[in-house]
Amino acid sequence: MVQQLSSLRGSSAEALQVLGEQVDGDRYTLEEFAALADDLFRAAALLRSEPALRRAVTDVSTPAEAKSSLVHGLLDGKLGAPAVDLLAQAVGLRWVAARDLADAVEHLGVVAAVRSAGRRESVRLSDELFVVAQVVEENAELRIALSDPVRSTDDKRELLRGLLAQRALPATVALVEQALAGSFRSFHAAVSEYQKVAAATQGEGVALVRVARELTEAERTRLEQALSTQYGRPVHLNIEVDPSLLGGMRVEIGDDVIDGTVVSRLDDARRRLAG
């Protein structure tokens, strides 16, 4: 089952689940998944840039067959058959808002990109996405360049290609580039969401762990095992070292937050004293 998008509600969420069958793990080869991801990202961009088209293919008063024919007429020969077939099916479903279709298509592209890495590389993909997000977050000059509205998307992609420079998986590169062109409020938000999708697609969870000092391998293993037992599935750790926490750790997994840092405990003590 494809991970749900929090922005989709009602019939849009149901439509995404129906379409998720088109990106099941055994449906295509890794190369075919990569091509599908690229096509879906291009389709999402087209839907966002053409409001009239977006409205036409989500108009509930237009028969599904007519909308499907419109998709085939526009995209046959321009995108691969799997992507066109998926889009033709998508426009026959009901969407709460016209923009939901583009968001769902992008999301399915992310899933396809994750599938293109293969299960053996799932941990590496998750790690690479985390590292890229951290590098950008910690490099003010790069962060400003990537958020500069004057710079073209192609220029920003060149900056990131230079950063990755043959070191990252093709799936990582595809997702990082899409993070610049998608619907998220920031590059960091996009990559963080893609990492969650990557974990969910491979049946894993992702825990963001903030600690005051580096964990030993034994400590990492114990924490990983404890969280995996608690959540009933493998949990991958992304660890941030922040000396300002003084000690302890803060764990975020999904909507759950476990804050056992010294700073948090001191803040609690101050509030109790003030009260």
UniProtKB/Swiss-Prot annotation:
Coiled coil ranges: none
Disulfide bond residue pairs: none
Domain of life: Bacteria
GO molecular function, one term: proton-transporting ATP synthase activity, rotational mechanism
Keyword Nuclease: no
Membrane topology according to the record: Peripheral membrane protein
Subcellular location as annotated: Cell membrane
Keyword annotations from UniProtKB, A to Z: ATP synthesis, Cell membrane, CF(1), Hydrogen ion transport, Ion transport, Membrane, Transport
Gene Ontology cellular component annotations, sorted alphabetically: plasma membrane; proton-transporting ATP synthase complex
Pfam families the UniProt entry points to: OSCP
UniProt function note: F(1)F(0) ATP synthase produces ATP from ADP in the presence of a proton or sodium gradient. F-type ATPases consist of two structural domains, F(1) containing the extramembraneous catalytic core and F(0) containing the membrane proton channel, linked together by a central stalk and a peripheral stalk. During catalysis, ATP synthesis in the catalytic domain of F(1) is coupled via a rotary mechanism of the central stalk subunits to proton translocation.
UniProt similarity note: Belongs to the ATPase delta chain family.
Subunit structure: F-type ATPases have 2 components, F(1) - the catalytic core - and F(0) - the membrane proton channel. F(1) has five subunits: alpha(3), beta(3), gamma(1), delta(1), epsilon(1). F(0) has three main subunits: a(1), b(2) and c(10-14). The alpha and beta chains form an alternating ring which encloses part of the gamma chain. F(1) is attached to F(0) by a central stalk formed by the gamma and epsilon chains, while a peripheral stalk is formed by the delta and b chains.
Protein name, UniProt field: ATP synthase subunit delta
Native species: Nocardioides sp. (strain ATCC BAA-499 / JS614)
